[in-house]
Curated annotation (Swiss-Prot):
Top-rank lineage group of the source organism: Eukaryota
Source organism of the structure: Dictyostelium discoideum (Social amoeba)
InterPro entries: GPCR_Fz/Smo-like
GN (gene name): fscG
Keywords associated with the record: Glycoprotein, Membrane, Receptor, Signal, Transmembrane, Transmembrane helix
Chief subcellular location: membrane
Glycosites: N49, N67, N148
Alphabetized Gene3D superfamilies for the sequence: Rhodopsin 7-helix transmembrane proteins
Record's protein name: Frizzled/smoothened-like sans CRD protein G
Amino acid sequence: MIYILKNFIIILFFLLIILKRIESQSLPSLPSPTIYKSSQCRGDLVYRNVSNRMEDEKIGFTFVQYNGTYQSCVIPCPSPFFTLDEWNKFLYMSLVMGTISFLCGLFLLITYSPIVNKTHNRHTIGVMCMSFGVCLAMCSDMWNFGSNFTDQKSICPSPGQYLTTSNSRCLGSGIVLQFGGVFGFLNWTLLSFDLFMNIKGIITKNYDKYYFVATFIIAIIFTFVPIVNDQYSMSYIGLGCWLGSAVYQLIFFWILLSICLIVSSVFIILILKEIYIIIKQSKQKTSLKGNIRPLLCITVTSFAFFYMFFYYISIVIEGDYYERILNEYTDCLMDPTKDVSECKFPRMSVANEFVFLLCLRLLGIGAFIFYGINKEVKKIWLNSFWFNNSFVGKYIGSKRSMGNDITNSYASKAYSKNYNNNNSINSYNSGLELSIIDMSCNKDDNFKPIIIK
């Protein structure tokens, strides 16, 4: 198992190097856009000579049509669906929540890695893979640190230009977001599946290395196939680069996400049902409290990602409507007989978009609540080198000399009480002090399954 963990870390290390090289590779430099003020492009439209339209569209410009003819004006970046102030609020929220989610994933990754964790169980690699996926996905937000939509640090390469696959930064961040999301969701689902099968005694053999290989291959396929058709780009309602086509988004992300979410939720509810049956038979109602948190976590996470899915579906269904009002807006601006003030901005719901972008960044926080706040994590850190070295020993010794012996004694007794029977089946059938979270983190790979007759 240690050998597998070492190979896993080596693979992750080289993957990071590859992604970094993609982000920094010297792709053909984009021609410097020529942006001029022009009375022809009124309102927030941006002037761009239409003579080289085909090449300009490849690098992110969208030219306006008027009376069936392409004009030397392009759609502004960011899009007029939201005001600049609203765009900046979206960006700042994504930076804050993305950073929090990244730190949550990083904490889990470090906690369950050999850096801290001296022991391992059948779910250690799965938690590490899920945490690594979260960290990668949230890196796409952290790449936007210091950026905004109002000055030379704008995410848009130039006024009226959207990021496309031809931009190395766009390609790198899109790959990181897609791979991290798919890899994280797959491992979250397999963790719940394996835990339920193990508890029921259907699967007792450890298949973690096969799970890792399968999820890694699927994530690679779902990430790199879209590159063939240059699918990574910045949309009218996005803060960065991701799959540009609605068809690709549906096939390579949303369908998979929905399946993972439904399957994982079903398995975790079934696990909670098994625990409830055991608790009911043993007449220990107090142990139900230990499972309120995972149930709440599942409820909130399910709401978040189902909201994302249905919001996405609504955008796809209403795509023709948004395209029509955008065309009406640009036609109004191009019509010399109309005043600019008469042109109605094509607005979308700020609240719906804000919640959508927020939900995207809840995966790391949900994983932290589920796998990062439990007795086993506390035990891992207390047994690690970081709490068992000469420096910490001297610090604890000095604290004891200041009169904290009673406190330390109490903590020691509490710690002993919690973990004396950690490897015993009685901790499940009699004490029932462990919740679903602690069961998934328990280090005994060979405990007997709980079978309700």
